[in-house]
């Protein structure tokens, strides 16, 4: 039986085919209701070990990966870098080689350096999942965003998606652009010129330095925070000025289609890039994104760690072909 996802790792969205993306989204759909059961657990990854190795702060991603592994019955180990040997000077490679000696099945890694998960994948037999690397990619965030959009809109192809804010530092914007354009959606980037990538068009996006034209007729509006921890110069004026010119408020949202949905990968800076009335409004699917994250990460762990040829996502043996 052909594997539904033919890759050993999930290091990025760039390069994945449309059928591979659909396979991941469909697997997440099959697992979505597990989290709504009275017993939120299936035996799919019993006997497997998942190690979460986060070199950057995280709330949603780390928690949802932990929940995803546990709801699949895997043994989940969370390593806090602040209390690990990394603070004593141990290199990423040495950390990974020591973890490999303990025979994990999956390593989930977040790191400030772009390309770090690729480096890890070259030095371990475990499957590697990129949980965000520098300003490069965040593949599971793009998958959960696509999952949320598909549930809300019934499709991805043909949609107009506006991604607004700090694009140049956003791995979320890059992964979403790769995924959405592969699936036939049209992507618009909007932000201050200092926060736009030099070659945004190379990601398949139409680029605007004002938010209003990007919002006009949009089906989906995704807001991004300004990543001040990555700023190294005078990238933007004051917070108040940024909110005035690029914040999503009810008046600006009215430029999008009446049934447009509003998204944000978090963490939100309320009153800066997004008005609380919009974040908590009827068009917001921000908490739906958070819920989708568990199902999507369950699907990724299942596909990479389990014998996907032999078992369904919920742990039942597949019928013989």
UniProtKB/Swiss-Prot annotation:
Keywords: Pyrimidine biosynthesis, Transferase. Signal peptide: none annotated. Carbamoyl phosphate binds at residues 60-61, 110, 138, 141, 266-267. GO terms for molecular function: amino acid binding; aspartate carbamoyltransferase activity. InterPro entries: Asp/Orn_carbamoyltranf_P-bd (IPR006132), Asp/Orn_carbamoylTrfase (IPR006130), Asp/Orn_carbamoylTrfase_sf (IPR036901), Asp_carbamoyltransf (IPR002082), Asp_carbamoyltransf_Asp/Orn-bd (IPR006131). Disulfide bonds: none annotated. GO terms for biological process: 'de novo' pyrimidine nucleobase biosynthetic process; 'de novo' UMP biosynthetic process; amino acid metabolic process. Belongs to the aspartate/ornithine carbamoyltransferase superfamily. ATCase family. This is Aspartate carbamoyltransferase catalytic subunit.
């Amino acid at each position: 039986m052909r594997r539904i996802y033919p890759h050993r790792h999930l290091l990025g969205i760039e390069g994945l085919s449309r059928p591979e993306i659909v396979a991941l989204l469909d697997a997440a759909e099959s697992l979505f209701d597990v989290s709504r059961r009275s017993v939120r657990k299936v035996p799919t990854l019993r006997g497997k070990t998942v190690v979460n190795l986060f070199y950057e702060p995280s709330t949603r991603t780390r928690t949802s990966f932990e929940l995803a592994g546990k709801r699949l019955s895997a043994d989940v180990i969370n390593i806090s870098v602040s209390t690990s040997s990394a603070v004593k000077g141990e290199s990423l490679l040495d950390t990974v080689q020591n973890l490999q000696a303990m025979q994990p099945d999956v390593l989930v890694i977040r790191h400030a350096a772009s390309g770090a998960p690729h480096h890890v994948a070259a030095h371990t037999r475990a499957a590697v999942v990129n949980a965000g690397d520098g300003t490069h990619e965040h593949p599971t965030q793009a998958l959960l965003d696509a999952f949320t959009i598909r549930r809300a809109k019934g499709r991805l192809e043909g949609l107009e998606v506006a991604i607004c804010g700090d694009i140049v530092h956003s791995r979320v914007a890059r992964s979403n652009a790769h995924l959405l354009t592969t699936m036939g959606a049209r992507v618009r980037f909007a932000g201050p010129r200092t926060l736009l990538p030099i070659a945004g068009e190379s990601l398949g996006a139409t680029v605007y330095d004002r938010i209003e034209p990007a919002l006009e007729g949009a089906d989906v509006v995704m807001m991004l925070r300004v990543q001040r921890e990555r700023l190294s110069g005078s990238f933007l004026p004051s917070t108040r000025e940024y909110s005035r010119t690029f914040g999503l408020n009810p008046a600006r949202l009215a430029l999008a289609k009446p049934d447009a949905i509003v998204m944000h990968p978090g963490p939100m800076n309320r009153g800066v890039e997004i008005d609380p009335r919009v974040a908590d409004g009827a068009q917001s699917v921000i908490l739906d994104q958070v819920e989708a994250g568990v199902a999507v990460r369950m699907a990724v762990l299942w596909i990479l760690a389990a014998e996907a040829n032999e078992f369904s996502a919920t742990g039942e043996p597949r019928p013989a072909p």
